[in-house]
Design a protein with these regions (language model features):
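Short hydrophobic alpha-helices and adjacent helix-cap/hinge residues
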Residues: 1-120
Length: 120
């Protein structure tokens, strides 16, 4: 099992990339990370809400809104090749202090001050 191997290697942490397979298993992954005392972070906010240590990534609602605007423009006849490339501009940081405490970690006050949400 991957988490057991990470625990044996005394890994300092793990970063989970956004992936539909992993996203649907956020609770299980957060529980495994906790069981093996491995700090885990992800880009998606619901990972921290599910028990992961930290999430930092795009705001899904803002990105979905932009996708809808582009879809509307294409449906009205604009060519996709003519639309400018855009990148996300809104990001959020979520810190799960309950998980940090369970892992024996202290989150720096500067991180907490920048967090959009702190789960206690």
């Amino acid at each position: 099992m991957a988490f057991a191997s990470l625990g044996q290697l005394q890994a300092g942490g793990i970063v989970l990339s956004p992936d539909p397979f992993l996203n649907s298993r956020s609770k299980q992954l957060a529980a495994l990370a906790s069981a093996y005392t491995i700090p885990a972070i992800s880009e998606l906010r619901f990972f921290a809400a599910a028990g992961g240590l930290i999430s930092y990534g795009i705001v899904d609602i803002a990105l979905s809104r932009q996708v809808g605007i582009y879809a509307g423009r294409i449906l009205k006849g604009e060519r996709p090749a003519d639309l400018p490339i855009q990148q996300p501009t809104k990001f959020e940081l979520v810190v799960n202090l309950k998980t940090a405490k369970a892992l024996g970690l202290t989150v720096a006050p500067s991180i907490l001050a920048r967090a959009d949400e702190v789960i206690e």
